[in-house]
């Protein structure tokens, strides 16, 4: 057990919403925080379900993830503030420092705010993942729940710009139809219940998405904006 209060922060959303970039940059600003990625809880390639229609692996299915281990790890982190499982991170997102320009003054101001958090009292753990709020058992473990969103066309364009993904055992490249038939369809199917009339391009249903805060991260959003917003949300939970 730890004497500190462990704050679990979830940054979730569809693939290519920008959640991992925001999580990585936040962890770079807040160096006392711990960052883990749900992607590190993918099963081995031969355990990932195969889609009956296309006869390919469905990496965007909830069944592709080891939720039992993920949930167990979150419980251990909540109790101890430390990671217990030896994780293999595949680093499938481009280095955000080479992709985005962040004003030095803004960066320093945000860093100073994070440095003001009393690390004798608080242990902040940031978790980035695409399947968090669809699973009630997982979702309820978090103190701060952030859903990063972007319009369908933006998500599709961003995903298409990626060369592929390192898995535990190989390298995956999306077939041409993969975003529509797997990525977005899985996001819609597993998150529709959080939205009014099940429309994942529409409004969150306050009755179903209780305590989930959203951030719209389209292509017109400067990276400093979500970083500042996430910082303020974390600071609210770490007041002396």
Swiss-Prot record:
UniProt similarity note: Belongs to the uridine kinase family. NRK subfamily.
Residues annotated as catalytic: 39 (proton acceptor)
Binding-site list for Mg(2+): 20, 39
Protein known as: Nicotinamide riboside kinase
EC annotation from Swiss-Prot or TrEMBL: 2.7.1.22, 2.7.1.173
Name of the top EC class for this enzyme: transferase
Family matches, as SUPFAM superfamilies: P-loop containing nucleoside triphosphate hydrolases
Catalyzed reaction equations: beta-nicotinamide D-riboside + ATP = beta-nicotinamide D-ribonucleotide + ADP + H(+); beta-D-ribosylnicotinate + ATP = nicotinate beta-D-ribonucleotide + ADP + H(+)
Binding site for ATP: 13-21, 158, 162-164, 208-210
GO cellular component terms attached to this protein's record: cytoplasm; fungal-type vacuole
InterPro entries: P-loop_NTPase, PRK/URK
Domain of life: Eukaryota
Further comment found in the protein's record: Present with 1460 molecules/cell in log phase SD medium.
Pathways involved: Cofactor biosynthesis; NAD(+) biosynthesis
Residue positions binding substrate: 39-42, 59-60, 159, 164-165
Keywords per UniProt: ATP-binding, Kinase, Magnesium, Metal-binding, Nucleotide-binding, Pyridine nucleotide biosynthesis, Transferase
CDD domains, per the entry: NRK1 (cd02024)
Physiological role: Catalyzes the phosphorylation of nicotinamide riboside (NR) and nicotinic acid riboside (NaR) to form nicotinamide mononucleotide (NMN) and nicotinic acid mononucleotide (NaMN).
GO molecular function: ATP binding; metal ion binding; nicotinate riboside kinase activity; ribosylnicotinamide kinase activity; ribosylnicotinate kinase activity
Gene3D superfamilies in the cross-refs: P-loop containing nucleotide triphosphate hydrolases (3.40.50.300)
